[in-house]
A protein has these predicted regions:
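Extended substrate-binding grooves/exosites of carbohydrate-active enzymes
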Residues: 1-180, 184, 190-210, 218-224, ...
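Compositionally biased low-complexity segments at domain edges in trafficked proteins
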Residues: 227-237
Length: 237
């Protein structure tokens, strides 16, 4: 029900399932919705009982868009949501949907029928998507550094973004053994590096390291893009 429905005001606490930025276009709507609710009901505790976006570890884009099911859009979505929640510290609870991909018989999306791919980890529990490491950067005290989009090896651009997640305050990036830059910040670090031929990048944060390889190609790798077909679940993204 909506925020004005009397049912929404029976309990002491309330949470909504909201997928603004996934089923509904516009990530910024999350901020507007929360601000509006808090303006109208300043004493009413608000939570998010579900939020998420689907992401496939085999689908990739350097310009991710809502509905493309790429690992990159899922990460972009969760980056926004975590910053959004941090801006609204009066919220009482948030519940990411979901930790793992799960069976959903009526769905036919992302190139794998019968599954919901909103998990931070694949259904078999073997592959941690980039979004998993984003939450680790925000929530975990275990020191780590993670280079994103490792599976997005083939790139057509002459300059690429190397995104790094870490819970350390400083991250240095090396390209083919040469230091390309160092940044201080929180959670998300972004570097621009030239891409000619094949490169190996290494991220260093304290005593933590991570490596990845990328190569320049003339034409996009077709396996990175989802080919959508009409299905019984076409009403979903």
């Amino acid at each position: 029900c909506g925020p004005f429905n009397p049912v929404a005001h029976i309990t002491d606490l309330v949470s909504w399932n909201l997928y603004l930025g996934w089923y509904v276009p516009g990530l910024f709507l999350n901020d507007l919705w929360m601000d509006f609710f808090h303006l109208v009901y300043p004493g009413r505790p608000l939570g998010f009982s579900e939020y998420g976006a689907e992401g496939m570890p085999n689908l990739h884009s350097s310009k991710p868009r809502r509905g493309d099911h790429t690992e990159e859009y899922q990460a972009k979505y969760h980056e926004y949501m975590l910053r959004c929640f941090d801006r609204h510290k009066w919220m009482w609870a948030t519940h990411v949907w979901n930790m793992f991909d799960f069976a959903a018989d009526a769905r036919d999306q992302g190139g794998e029928p019968g599954m919901n791919h909103k998990g931070l980890v694949t259904f078999d529990r073997k592959t941690r998507k980039d979004s998993f490491y984003l939450y680790k950067a925000w929530w975990s005290d275990e020191n780590f550094v993670h280079i994103c989009s490792k599976r997005f090896t083939d790139r057509t651009e002459s300059e690429m973004e190397v995104k790094v997640y870490s819970n350390q305050k400083s991250v240095a990036l090396y390209v083919n053994g040469e230091k390309a830059g160092e940044q201080t910040g929180e959670h998300v670090f972004s570097f621009r590096v030239p891409l000619t031929g094949e490169i190996e990048v290494r991220a260093v944060a304290g005593d933590c390291t991570d490596t990845a390889s990328f190569r320049h190609v003339d034409t996009p790798n077709p396996s990175y893009k989802l080919v959508k077909t009409k299905s019984k679940s076409a009403n979903w993204v």
